[in-house]
């Protein structure tokens, strides 16, 4: 039997690609990507190119978005979505995943640039929420997850030259 967590992550990758593809009728405001990275670890460290700019160009024109999915944790539940205080092997399994997108944020942004960055992040947050919702619905309809739920989406940064949006989803396997 395959790990159902891998299936949930695969469904999430597919939905993120669908919502962030650059060649759709209404592409992402900040530019899209077909690349969704599956990452590991406690936190996501965007690759250096996300926050890199040419010395003569502070516009971030040459750095694209970095989109990812990460398994945050595995846990046990007696009544989803509440985590069991003592997780015996007989309890239902559950996972929490995170989807996120990181983009370049210039140090010397003008007020107009800051407004544009805010609108891009608003668009990113909507797309991640929709992608996670669609992936969780697919997981339930395919019988991979008994129950699902979305966590809150939250901004990160700007830190250095990076700004990001992160959101979690939970699935009872």
Predicted region positions:
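Short acidic, glycine/proline-rich loop/turn micro-motifs
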Residues: 109-114
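Oligomerization/assembly interface segments of phage tail-like spikes and tubes
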Residues: 91-107, 159-173
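Small/polar-rich, solvent-exposed N-terminal microdomains that initiate assembly or binding
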Residues: 1-85
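Acidic-leaning, charged glycine-interspersed low-complexity segments
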Residues: 23-40, 117-172
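Short, solvent-exposed beta-strand/turn "edge" segments of beta-rich domains on protein surfaces
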Residues: 82-91, 156-160
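Short, solvent-exposed segments of well-ordered alpha helices
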Residues: 86, 90-93, 115, 119
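The N-terminal extracellular segments of secreted preproproteins, especially immediately downstream
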Residues: 59-62, 88, 103, 132
